[in-house]
Amino acid sequence: MHYDISFPHLGITLDHVGKSVDLFGVSIAYYGIIIGMAILIGFAIATSEAKRTRQNPEDYLDMGIIGVIAGIAGARIYYVIFSWDMYKDDLLDIFNLREGGLAIYGGVIAAVISIFVLAKVKHLSPFQIFDTIAMALLNGQMLGRWGNFFNREAFGEYTDRLFAMRLPVDAVRSGDITEKMREHMERINGVSYIQVHPTFLYESLWCAVLLIILVLYRKHKKYEGELFLLYLFGYGLGRVWIEGLRTDQLLLPGIGIPVSQLLAGALVIGTGIALLYLGRHHKNSPMHRSVTKYEPMPEKIKGKKPPKWNERLFKNMK
């Protein structure tokens, strides 16, 4: 197998991009490493935002653990349901995450449901929580897509545009290669290559832009839940376009419609209507009242400046 990946029109060539790294004799997939990094950074973002908005960050550690477990399970279940032909003959392969196979929509849906239930149990505002985790979710999606890069998956149809990505045929699943890719296949130094849209890169950059927008807008939000609605609207808008470029779409059985593209379209319409309505009527909504009623910051979160060295010294001398 050949491990090089290149972006010919950008003059970028990476000669050896493996799918895993060996540490102390154990092979660890880059996909898993990236997901782990995304989770840790997401925790940091959510707890930092919780402190900024006078919430208890410990609540987010509890919800984060439940949300991550539910999210990974939901992402896998969603993927398996719409790719059942790949797993029906070997059910144990369902539990093999080393080769990827996580659907972002399934993960977000499962995580949001679990966090909503936990918020109700803890008597917290779910809308405030969703705003707090919106940037953490975007970070996870932005970084997580690079797992697709290492796995040579989630790419689009043939293209010869500026960001075209060139992959060795023997490093790609045969089922992901379309007729159009075969027609434009190149042979370089005895190796066959396909050239495709790097849709993982498009989505990662799209999420990065959305993340910057939310960071800049967060201090100007009008009601709890607005940041989360903007996240859903913006992500859905990008996904409608990007999903149309992909060749490994998860299809609705018997219909052949890309399920993620359908969900993205519904998400854009639904959140768009909600944003327009709440933009006018948020003052009469419980979501508005919760934005002005933060719980007092716990004493250990407020923090107290430690006494200076001379204050400690004189105190001990008294």
What positions do the PLM features span?
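A feature for loop-to-transmembrane-helix boundaries and adjacent hydrophobic helices
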Residues: 1-318
